[in-house]
Regions:
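C-terminal domain-boundary segment and adjacent tail
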Residues: 147, 152-166, 223-331
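Active-site-adjacent pocket scaffolds in enzyme catalytic domains
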Residues: 106-251
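Metal-dependent polysaccharide deacetylase catalytic core of the NodB/CE4 family, i.e.
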Residues: 49-132, 155-156, 253-255, 298
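Short, solvent-exposed loop/turn segments at secondary-structure junctions
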Residues: 7-10, 53-57, 81-83, 124-127, ...
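Well-ordered, non-membrane alpha-helical segments in soluble/globular domains
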Residues: 16-36, 60-62, 90-101, 134-144, ...
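The substrate-binding groove and active-site-proximal loops of carbohydrate-active enzymes
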Residues: 11-24, 46-55, 81-88, 122-135, ...
């Protein structure tokens, strides 16, 4: 089980004072929620993944997240909002951001001796997937991410956006046509012992319908928000719909947790318990009821769990021992 937060402290063009207050709230509340959660099968607390926007970098906003990472209850990965992008600009931005996260804050993980990162695309427009080309502009983004050391993309699902790919409820490999946008629209499902089967690994969240308490079905896509908080019924649907590799279930949830309304729903307020605290309890109880062994995971640990099933994976390597990530100065 992983939570991938499109974590945007400066989202909505707020002041630095507001952004600092947003981050401080998480630094105060999240450690207590993680500590109170049921331990998983390995005795671990939940580990929250903050996908932080490259364009919002401020050292004073990142350092509290780095502190939670050092405590073992958080991790920081890469997020970006861009438009009319070029390959050269993208390499410079991602490479520079990764170096800054590592050199200034000790963040990002190493895999096979190379620094790697997980990725979420802002405004959902991964690989220039919006029909009119907005919010990206970079066809071939999948291949660049692969070569820069991205171990997996966590953007999907994106309904009702037209950027949504055709493949749902799978952990899969992109196999789109080079030179054409939306390479993740085609792919091969990750399988036990299958190894690398495409350009980039896609770890997607649950997609389906839910009916309880509704006259008209609602689309379920694993988002936790103020207008769609966790419920016991939703937890059951997540486990029904989540991607599988063999008998293992990979449940990826997402949110925009820096926003005040969503932070209220996730962390709680002075008058109410937050949705995360209840969600962890429901997940633990329902998993036990279904005889499922729970593992709380960061985005990176989710990737390593996939690798344990598929066999060795080599993010940042184009089928050769030379780390292609070095084109951006990423080591």
């Amino acid at each position: 089980v992983s939570i991938t937060d499109h974590y945007e402290p400066l989202g909505g063009h707020v002041s630095m004072e507001t952004a600092l207050r947003r981050v401080a709230r998480w630094q105060d509340a999240w450690p207590r929620i993680a500590d109170a959660a049921p331990r998983d099968a390995d005795g671990r607390m939940p580990c929250y993944s903050f996908f932080y926007p490259e364009e919002e970098y401020r050292a004073e906003l990142l350092e509290p997240l780095a502190e939670m990472t050092r405590q073992g209850i958080g991790d920081v990965e890469v997020h970006i909002h861009h438009d009319r992008e070029t390959a050269e600009g993208f390499i410079r931005k991602i490479g520079g951001f990764c170096r800054r996260l590592r050199d200034d804050h000790g963040l990002l993980n190493d895999h096979n001796g190379q620094m790697v990162f997980g990725f979420i695309h802002g405004n959902w427009a991964l690989d220039n997937s919006h029909p009119v080309g907005v919010n990206c502009g970079l066809t071939g983004e999948i291949e660049l991410l692969r070569d820069l050391g991205c171990y997996a993309d966590f953007t999907m699902p994106s309904l009702p956006s037209p950027t949504q790919g055709r493949i749902v409820n799978q952990v899969y490999w992109c196999t789109g046509t080079p030179g054409k946008p939306k390479a993740f629209d085609r792919g091969i499902e990750a399988t036990i012992g299958g190894g690398v089967q495409g350009d980039l690994l896609m770890i997607t969240g649950p997609v389906g319908l839910r009916y309880a308490g509704r006259l008209v079905p609602r689309i379920e896509m694993g988002e936790i928000a103020a207008n769609d908080p966790p419920t016991e019924y939703r937890v059951r649907r997540w486990l029904d719909l989540a991607p599988r590799i063999g008998g293992d279930i990979f449940l990826k949830l997402y949110t925009h947790g820096a926003r005040e309304d969503n932070a209220d729903a996730l962390l709680g307020t002075s008058t109410g318990v937050g949705g995360l605290q209840e969600m962890f309890r429901w997940l633990h109880e329902i998993a036990a009821e279904r005889e499922i062994e729970v593992h709380w995971a960061s985005a990176y640990r989710t990737f390593t769990a996939v690798e344990a099933l598929t066999g060795p994976l080599h993010p940042g390597f184009r089928g050769s021992p030379e780390p292609i990530g070095s084109i951006a100065g990423v080591r």
